[in-house]
């Protein structure tokens, strides 16, 4: 946890001022996407208080309660509960705090999310065998997925996926999901990201019928499982742009797997990006995602995530 998190008390007048500031934020009001958060912005602390029920005086207590709940549940001998306790052994307070924030400081729900986090790894071991930054680096360099180096005006991390040039014989669906898993773990080390969350932009321009036919329902279910109750991440929105008419067939396969909360956060724009631009400023988006910046550069982002190639740590998650 960063040293700057919650180191002062605010009077109501200050809180009202910060709430007003939250209504008029720009991308410049937020910290970097990559690397740790050295100090949370004051307006982000207020957001955590208002949206996540976070208070400085109860933060440590909530972490302790979750740690105790993990051990109490494991004592029952239930298989998944034991696996959870084994998985979190040696984890610091910052690790537990991610789950508590993701469930708005409700310790019981945070524990259920922790169970989901461990269960996802048990359910899909093929995604986590020998998983490391080096193992997914080539996939990230190819842009599957991408990450904007600037937060959006709401402070969210923006993840990108451009399906047009994706060849499933060169990069498999599982390899893409592995890259997502590594990136999420890495970016969730940042407290600002824990509070503000993520959004995803999926560019389906050039999506072919052959690609659509190659997407198995089991793969799509695996992707949805990753987004729902398997990471201590707040997924705030998923935006689809430039999708062809037959995208509906693929989407209809996915929809039954989506819980109502996530389904309400899916936006399908097509060619009309007017509402899309109300959410995202063009000057933070690459040209291949409807913006004014140069085309997305996956190699540059991989270096920001993992460092130069010769310094990449081969540390399994």
From Swiss-Prot:
Domain CRAL-TRIO: 136-297
A GO cellular component entry from the record: nucleoplasm
GO MF annotation list: 11-cis retinal binding; phosphatidylinositol bisphosphate binding; retinol binding
Keyword annotations: Acetylation, Cytoplasm, Retinol-binding, Sensory transduction, Transport, Vision
InterPro entries per UniProt: CRAL-TRIO_dom (IPR001251), CRAL-TRIO_dom_sf (IPR036865), CRAL/TRIO_N_dom (IPR011074), CRAL/TRIO_N_dom_sf (IPR036273)
GO biological process, one term: visual perception
Pfam families recorded: CRAL_TRIO, CRAL_TRIO_N
Tissues with expression: Retina and pineal gland.
Binding annotation for 11-cis-retinal: 180, 202
Keyword Zinc: no
Modification sites for N-acetylserine: 2
Organism superkingdom: Eukaryota
Described purpose of this protein according to its UniProt entry: Soluble retinoid carrier essential the proper function of both rod and cone photoreceptors. Participates in the regeneration of active 11-cis-retinol and 11-cis-retinaldehyde, from the inactive 11-trans products of the rhodopsin photocycle and in the de novo synthesis of these retinoids from 11-trans metabolic precursors. The cycling of retinoids between photoreceptor and adjacent pigment epithelium cells is known as the 'visual cycle'.
Subunit structure and binding partners: Interacts with DEGS1; the interaction increases synthesis of chromophore-precursors by DEGS1.
Protein known as: Retinaldehyde-binding protein 1
Species the sequence originates in: Bos taurus (Bovine)
Gene: RLBP1
């Amino acid at each position: 946890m960063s040293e700057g998190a919650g180191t002062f008390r605010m009077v109501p007048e200050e809180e009202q001022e910060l709430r007003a500031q939250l209504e008029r934020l720009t991308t410049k009001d937020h910290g970097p996407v990559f690397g740790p958060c050295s100090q949370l912005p004051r307006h982000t602390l207020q957001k955590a208080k208002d949206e996540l029920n976070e208070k400085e005086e109860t933060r440590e207590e909530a972490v302790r309660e979750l740690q105790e709940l993990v051990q109490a549940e494991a004592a029952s001998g239930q298989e998944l509960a034991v696996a959870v306790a084994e998985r979190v052994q040696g984890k610091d307070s910052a690790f537990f705090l991610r789950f508590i924030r993701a469930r708005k400081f409700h310790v019981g729900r945070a524990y259920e999310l922790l169970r989901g986090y461990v269960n996802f790894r048990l359910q899909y071991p093929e995604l986590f065998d020998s998983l490391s930054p080096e193992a997914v680096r080539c996939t990230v360099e190819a842009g599957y997925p991408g990450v904007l180096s600037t937060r959006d005006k709401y402070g969210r991390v923006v993840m990108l996926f451009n399906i047009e040039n994706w060849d499933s014989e060169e990069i498999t669906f599982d390899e893409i999901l592995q890259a997502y898993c590594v990136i999420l773990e890495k970016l969730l080390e940042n407290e600002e990201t824990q509070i503000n969350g993520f959004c995803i932009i999926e560019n389906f321009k050039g999506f072919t019928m052959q690609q659509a036919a190659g997407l198995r329902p089991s793969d799509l279910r695996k992707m949805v499982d990753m987004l729902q109750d398997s990471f201590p991440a707040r997924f705030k929105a998923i935006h689809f742009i430039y999708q062809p008419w037959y995208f509906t067939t693929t989407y209809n396969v996915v929809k039954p797997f989506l819980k109502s909360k996530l389904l309400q956060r899916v936006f399908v724009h097509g060619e009309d990006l007017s509402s899309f631009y109300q959410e995202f400023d063009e000057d933070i988006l690459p040209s291949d995602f409807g913006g004014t910046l140069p085309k997305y550069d996956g190699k540059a982002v991989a270096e920001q995530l993992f460092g130069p190639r010769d310094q990449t740590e081969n540390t399994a998650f």
